[in-house]
Amino acid sequence: MTITVVLGAQWGDEGKGKLVDGQCRDAQLCARAAGGHNAGHEVRVSFHLLPSGLINPKWFYHSMNFIGSGVVFHVPSFFSELQELEDKGLVAVHDRILVSDRVNVLLDMHIAVDGLEERELGGIGPCYQASRARNGIKLTDVFHPELFEQKVRRLADGYQKRFGELFDYDIKAELARFDEYRETLKKYVVDGVSFMRSAQQSDMKIVIEGANALMLDIDYGSYPFVTSSSTTLAGIIGGLTLNPKNITEVVGVVKAYTTRVGSGAFKTEDTEEIGTKLQEIGREWGTSTGRRRRSYTDLVVVKYSNSINYYDSLNLTKLDILDTFETIKIAIAYKVDGEELDSYPADLDILERAEVVYHEMPGWQKPTTNAKTYYDLPKAAREYIEYIEKFVGVKVKYIGTGPDREAMIQRA
């Protein structure tokens, strides 16, 4: 048995799906541990809730996909994504996906509340809030209609008292939808703890796909501009009941430059020529949330990320996007009043006052897209990679050199 965990090391959209896709080609299980249908990932198909392993061409090897207990589960999105995959010709998708009975069910009610609280409209935050307040709804509750209705009405009553007439929600329509879903859902639902225990006792190759990224973690991200779940290795372990001793490799995925979506501190952001060039060449449009903010690589962030997730290796993605740059800048420190900070700060005032220290390296100005091995890369590209390795203290094992599935160099 081997377990490979793939985690985003920046603010998301690093390209985790491509590595997961490659790792899942001969895997027996691909799983997600946390997050919800707002965590977009794209290889050839845009995913949000489902694991990327569903596009594994070797489905006949009994490759299974699993949504773990830490996920918030929006049933309409689950069915619509499965239908989209089926429409695109992917085989046996309904037979290759299972869901833990302990996931929290994300209702349209949560989405309505999210809109009232002026956040993103996915309902992720209110669903996690309900869970922590112990009035959430587990997937197992759905199969007890009277209990399910009681819980939905109790939750709706609480929101009605809080928001009054602003709370526009059709509880009868929601309950009717679940009356339709109930029988169809049954085939996908398993005891998540038992399933993962059996998987870890087998000879399976297991690939775990992290949602979002470290800098969006509820505890260690750039708070408060974060998601509502744990995106760390600890969140993976808890969301899937993994035995930490069974983990073979933890891979941090790092884009060769830095992007983030939405509000929040982004010290290296470039809104001028470089940022525009990165956006145009890199096609920087988020799977879930649209336009991304761009900058050169911020190794302060990557090193901080490694201090929490302790990566065994890194996957550097989209190296080819830098092929035409004459000079490449790398953020290597933050300074306040001339003094270098030890790490990425939690204090937003300190972060606001911090100045970024850059290291400049010559670009390679040669195409990397045809490189099959590490030494096919231009020397300056290798020096860039090796600088990242030395600074972070983790080997760059996987290098993405283009959008194709095969455009990935793996070093020994």
Swiss-Prot record:
Its EC number is 6.3.4.4. IMP binds at residues 13-16, 38-41, 134, 212, 227, 291. It is an enzyme of class 6 (ligase). Binds 1 Mg(2+) ion per subunit. PROSITE patterns: ADENYLOSUCCIN_SYN_1. Gene3D superfamilies: Adenylosuccinate Synthetase, subunit A, domain 1, Adenylosuccinate Synthetase, subunit A, domain 2, Adenylosuccinate Synthetase, subunit A, domain 3. Mg(2+) binds at residues 13, 40. The keyword Membrane does not apply. Keywords: Cytoplasm, GTP-binding, Ligase, Magnesium, Metal-binding, Nucleotide-binding, Purine biosynthesis. GO terms for cellular component: cytoplasm. Substrate binds at residues 287-293. GTP binds at residues 12-18, 40-42, 293, 318-320, 400-402. Its main location: cytoplasm. It is found in: Cytoplasm. GO terms for biological process: 'de novo' AMP biosynthetic process; IMP metabolic process. NCBIfam families: PRK01117.1, purA. Homodimer. HAMAP family: Adenylosucc_synth. This is Adenylosuccinate synthetase.
